[in-house]
Amino acid sequence: MASEGVLLGMGNPLLDISCVVDDAFLEKYGLTLNNAILAEDKHLPMYKELAANPDVEYIAGGATQNTIRIAQWMLGESNATSYFGCVGKDEYGDRMFKLASEGGVNIRYDVDEDLPTGTCGVLVVKGERSLVANLSAANKYKIDHLKKPENWAFVEKAKYIYSAGFFLTVSPESMMTVAKHAAETGKYYMINLAAPFICQFFKDPLMELFPYVDFIFGNESEARAFAQVQGWETEDTKVIAVKLAALPKAGGTHKRVAVITQGTDPTIVAEDGKVTEFPVTPIPKEKLVDTNAAGDSFVGGFLSQLVLGKDIAQCVRAGNYAASVIIQRSGCTFPSKPSFESQ
């Protein structure tokens, strides 16, 4: 059984505005598939255009929130997980609180009085996705919220703490605070590379945090972007995974494990200079709905078993199961109960 509040996530809560579009729509806004970016002024009219589409869907999103919701769903025990992030004082914020709390996650939103709740345009073309995040209120998360005694109590309770790298654009100070707390108390601190732009443009805060990172997650394009920025001169994901795991560690932390997903290609896990590959069972093309939140779901499934003390093979199996469920549905939505059997 998972103890109450064992897993804490901190990130950018965004309401996903999801729509199937065509290639011309991507071209119009200068977007590419399988990428995630922050919205610029030129992208802002896009949100109105999506909202006007009769088939638009609104889904609770944001990478870390997706991961925590999936972990909670897999664990099935109310309040096993908690989540911090900032929303606006509006209907979108209320809607997302309801959606995210339904599965039993203990949601602790900071509420910004001035800005609307953040949104993410999810553009789906033939099952592949392009993400454009307008952080808005999510960008206003303050360390003061984290340090309030009633919120810090959730940090104290957690044994595993996770953030997607996207949170580095908002509150690296909050990430560093909980990372140091984890090192001092023997807990696990875990992050996701999240997107190539995090590796490229937020290198300094990322590398400052890295000595405290016990588990690093990412997909092949993020891993290669990281390697390029580090000057490693390799595109071999196995080599990159070993190097990621071997980067210097702070005292009091655990040995780092690097986990790289590669779509339908094997998942790579590196630890102590050794690489293990775990095959992925591909989903038939006709069953693929969209890949939005596939990576987040993998991590959610993985963490659901990690917090139960299961071995890495079981964690990867659970991650692959969760991702396979999510890509057969629209956005980060899931059936009422998982059919995964813990071994």
Swiss-Prot record:
It catalyses: adenosine + ATP = AMP + ADP + H(+). Pathway: Purine metabolism; AMP biosynthesis via salvage pathway; AMP from adenosine: step 1/1. Coiled coil: none annotated. GO terms for cellular component: cytosol; nucleus. Its cofactor is Mg(2+). The active site is at residue 296. One of its GO terms (biological process) is purine nucleobase metabolic process. It is an enzyme of class 2 (transferase). One of its GO terms (molecular function) is ATP binding. Its EC number is 2.7.1.20. Keywords: ATP-binding, Kinase, Magnesium, Nucleotide-binding, Purine salvage, Transferase. ATP dependent phosphorylation of adenosine and other related nucleoside analogs to monophosphate derivatives. Can also act on the cytokinin isopentenyladenosine to produce isopentenyladenosine monophosphate. Belongs to the carbohydrate kinase PfkB family. This is Adenosine kinase. It comes from Physcomitrium patens (Spreading-leaved earth moss). The gene is ADK.
